[in-house]
C-alpha cells in the first residue's frame, strides 16, 4: 500500500574530528535535541553510533520536507547547534532527506 508523502525523514551520517571523544560529543547532544524540539514540524530525533565504521547516524522525522529543509538551514546558524557542529568532520557528512512510500512494519503483537 502506498503511503502519503506528508512526513519527511532526515538522515545525517558523519564522523567526528580527530581527537574528539565520544563523551565530549555526547555532551553537546542535549542542546541540539532541545533546539530541534522547538522547530516547526519536528516529530522525533534519535542519535546512533556505528562502531564498525566509526560513524554517527542522526535520524530526524519532520512533518514535511519543507520543515526539514528550513530546520537544516536554521541549524547552520544556531548557537545551540554550533558546539556540536564544531566537533563534526564536515567533509565526512552525508545528509539525506526522503519521504515514506510504504506503511511502516511493526513487530507482531
Pin down the residues of each PLM region.
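Glycine-rich beta-strand-turn "strand-cap" elements at beta-sheet edges
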Residues: 1-8, 14-17, 44-54, 80-109
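Short, flexible segments with low predicted structural confidence
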Residues: 7-8, 24, 39-40
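Short hydrophobic/aromatic beta-strand micro-patches
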Residues: 13-15, 59-61
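Short, surface-exposed ligand-recognition loops at beta-strand->loop->(often short) alpha-helix junctions
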Residues: 15-27
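Short acidic, gly/pro-rich beta-turn/loop elements at beta-sheet edges
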Residues: 22-24, 57, 68-70, 105
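An amphipathic, aromatic/His-enriched active-site/gating alpha helix that lines ligand/cofactor pockets
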Residues: 31, 37-43, 61-96
Amino acid at each position: 500500500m502506498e503511503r502519503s508523502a506528508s512526513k519527511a525523514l532526515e538522515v545525517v551520517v558523519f564522523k567526528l574530528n580527530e581527537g574528539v571523544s565520544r563523551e565530549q560529543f555526547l555532551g553537546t547532544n542535549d542542546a541540539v535535541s532541545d533546539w530541534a524540539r522547538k522547530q516547526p514540524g519536528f516529530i522525533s530525533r534519535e542519535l546512533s553510533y556505528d562502531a564498525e565504521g566509526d560513524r554517527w547516524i542522526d535520524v530526524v522525522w519532520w512533518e514535511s520536507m519543507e520543515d526539514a529543509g528550513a530546520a537544516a538551514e536554521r541549524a547552520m546558524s544556531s548557537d545551540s547547534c554550533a558546539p556540536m557542529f564544531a566537533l563534526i568532520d564536515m567533509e565526512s557528512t552525508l545528509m539525506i532527506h526522503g519521504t515514506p512510500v510504504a506503511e511502516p512494519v511493526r513487530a507482531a503483537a
